[in-house]
């Protein structure tokens, strides 16, 4: 991935956020894909740099993977930093978790803490936002793309899952004073609900237009994946898209490179046209 292409993609993203009046709603965020190293992925777009607690698996095409057992990010932004009725939390999911866990949270570890924030999955997507009792079954647990919640009133929240926005009644409470974490939830010294999802973006801030944010983040992620695929065979790209659609998750960069090498090699050896049906 060339530096110039990365810069163009991120520049387009930031300009788009500003054009859509979203940029000032984001108070802490990381673009955790596209960079050559984990350190680059954890450089903040806005806000303080997050603290890495054990995360080590990084793919520049699809982001950082949790381990589902002990690793998480501390965003170093407190849940109280945004007003009670003016808040959003969002992640972009490249690969959903394999078990019940949270994407992004503040509090509620081991119980229903008033004023906590949780966005994660059990049988479906569940959400707390300045609340103790969660809303559940808001969307599929296997949903990829933007998963987000925004609150702009004391009475209701809006969630964004699988490209659809839904407004639900959920009374707000005074926000719990806890650091917002990604890949797990923490209350004091207790950390639980670790996730093995792969996440290339998170943001925290004031209430925002989730549909517009979804469009901008999805475009950025598509741009970064396209840069990774520069020079790929068109038939390899078509196959990659079909596999990702069937799996409901984005493929790791090494897998994409291997498949492209296979297709290109078959064509170089004049074998491709003789293959009428094939599965990997």
Regions found by a protein language model. Give the residues of each.
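Polar, enzyme-active/binding microenvironments
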Residues: 1-280
């Amino acid at each position: 991935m060339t530096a110039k292409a990365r810069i163009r993609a991120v520049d387009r993203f930031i300009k788009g956020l500003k054009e859509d009046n979203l940029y000032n709603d984001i108070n802490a965020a990381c673009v955790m894909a596209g960079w050559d190293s984990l350190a680059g992925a954890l450089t903040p777009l806005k806000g303080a740099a997050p603290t890495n607690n054990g995360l080590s698996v990084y793919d520049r095409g699809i982001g950082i993977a949790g381990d589902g057992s002990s690793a998480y990010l501390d965003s170093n932004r407190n849940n109280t930093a945004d007003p009670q009725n003016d808040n959003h939390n969002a992640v972009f999911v490249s690969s959903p978790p394999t078990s019940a866990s949270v994407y992004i949270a503040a509090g509620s570890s081991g119980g229903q803490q008033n004023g906590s924030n949780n966005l994660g999955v059990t049988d479906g997507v569940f959400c707390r936002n300045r609340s103790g009792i969660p809303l559940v079954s808001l969307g599929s647990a296997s949903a990829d793309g933007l998963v987000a919640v925004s609150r702009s009133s004391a009475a209701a929240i809006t969630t964004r899952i699988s490209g659809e926005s839904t407004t639900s009644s959920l009374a707000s409470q005074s926000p719990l004073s806890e650091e917002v974490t990604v890949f797990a939830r923490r209350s004091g010294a207790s950390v639980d609900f670790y996730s093995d999802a792969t996440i290339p973006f998170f943001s925290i801030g004031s209430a925002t237009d989730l549909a517009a944010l979804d469009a901008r983040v999805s475009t950025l992620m598509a741009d970064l994946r396209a840069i990774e695929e520069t020079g790929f065979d068109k038939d390899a790209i078509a196959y990659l898209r079909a596999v990702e659609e069937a799996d409901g998750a984005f493929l790791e960069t090494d897998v994409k490179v291997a498949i492209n090498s296979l297709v290109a090699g078959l064509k170089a050896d004049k074998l491709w046209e003789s293959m009428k049906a094939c599965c990997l």
